[in-house]
Amino acid sequence: MLAATCNKIGSPSPSPSSLSDTSGSFGKGFHPWKRSSSTSSSCTLASGSLSGFSVGGSSRSANGSSSSSAAAAAAAAAAAAAAAALVSDSFSCGGSPGSSAFSLTSGGSGGSGGGGSSGSMSAASPFANEYSVFPVSGGSQEAAAAAAAAAAAAAAAASHHQPVFLSKVHASVDGLQSIYPRVGMAHPYESWFKPSHPGEVSAAAAGGASSWWEVGAGWIDVQSPGAGAALHPGALQGSLHSPLGGYGTDYSAAGLGHFSTGGGGGVGSGGGAAGTGSGGGGGGSHLLSPGGQHLMDGFKPVIGPGSYPDPSSSPLSAGSMLAPTGPLGGSPRSSARRYSGRATCDCPNCQEAERLGPAGASLRRKGLHSCHIPGCGKVYGKTSHLKAHLRWHTGERPFVCNWLFCGKRFTRSDELQRHLRTHTGEKRFACPVCNKRFMRSDHLSKHVKTHSVGGGSTGSTGPGSGSKKGSDTDSEHSPSTSPTCHSPDLLHPPDRNGLE
């Protein structure tokens, strides 16, 4: 009966008839590789003719005689005491001392003829090379002796196979490595853009089924060395022609020929086959160089007079993203002048001096800035004055009065300051002769002229000078009680001459 039961170890569901006599006597142990507790008890049973492991437990005896098995167990107990202690200490988990998660324990029920007897059955499981189940003590002294003998056999067999837990863990790790070959990599795409040998990428792309995390050929068409075109020329033409068509000549020389699009080979309409570095139907350059060059190493910009492609080769090159070479090197004079450390000026005199170079040093020493508007011809000694003058031509008025409900705009800052004095009533310009004060400097200059004119006509200084004074000064801003200003020299010249 036991032999028939052990022959059905591999079966997932043993028949109830074979386990009816043994299922009640054997306890339930913890077996991580089995799901059902009823089927786990049959994994370590074997016939008496096999050798390797022994399972301690109480079996039903037909006649109740167990003296021979007890004597054999007592003889082997002395030799295997140390091994049994080692096994019980190493594989014990909770419960009673010496109990193991990898063992089957007996219940201790007696048979029909006699109770408390146990049979020492040596067994070699079909899983001897994979699983190591260590039996421990049951419910009687005979079971403990049988467990010691089984531990000795297990210690001898432990040198050429692994325990259950270690073997299952190693098997699980190996299975993970076979299922997920890229688990141990530092970068998820390391093997894609940095292969150990040049043919790895092409082999992975040309190989049958690819994993979901691998970059397919739809993103960048990978080509193997010696091929005339890419793997999917249609996808390359549709996805890479428009955005990268203008960079074909530059990156073909850099070793990334798969980005170039062209006509040779029946792929495009430009010059050079798609995927080839030199045009025609020759061998295309690989995605990576044999020296382990990174993918991004080829994306170095190439700046030069011929780096910009023909506008007809790509619709993107004629747009705003790729400007022609003219604006880049168009005005070196303005760029040099901008960082020369002096104020910039675009007047005709300054441009002529810069065009002449060293010969225009005389023009630069003069510092004359002329207006470039035809018909104007005004010349200023400062660039700020010229810029203020140009605002008169353009109509720009950047200076705004912030007084309440005013908001007037002016072309020059001094005009704004003069306007603000009308709000505040400040008169900052005083006459040096009569100490009369004015708001504007031009009004003061006109007033000073009245003193010089009055000196020429000594007799006519009354009403004539008063009318002229009123015309020179702004009556609304001048004080009403201000006396008529006359110079002392003009008032009393005869008396002074008589005193002398």
Curated annotation (Swiss-Prot):
Keywords: DNA-binding, Metal-binding, Nucleus, Repeat, Transcription, Transcription regulation, Zinc, Zinc-finger. Residues 1-46, 304-337, 445-500 are annotated as: Disordered. Residues 453-467 have a biased composition (Gly residues). It is found in: Nucleus. Disulfide bonds: none annotated. InterPro entries: Znf_C2H2_sf, Znf_C2H2_type. A motif (9aaTAD) lies at residues 210-218. One of its GO terms (molecular function) is zinc ion binding. GO terms for biological process: regulation of transcription by RNA polymerase II. It holds the Pfam family zf-C2H2. A zinc finger (C2H2-type) spans 369-393, 399-423, 429-451. The keyword Cell membrane does not apply. Residues 10-25, 36-46, 305-317, 478-488 have a biased composition (Low complexity). One of its GO terms (cellular component) is nucleus. The keyword Ion transport does not apply. Transcription factor which plays a key role in limb development. Positively regulates FGF8 expression in the apical ectodermal ridge (AER) and contributes to limb outgrowth in embryos. The 9aaTAD motif is a transactivation domain present in a large number of yeast and animal transcription factors. Belongs to the Sp1 C2H2-type zinc-finger protein family. This is Transcription factor Sp8. It comes from Xenopus laevis (African clawed frog). The gene is sp8.
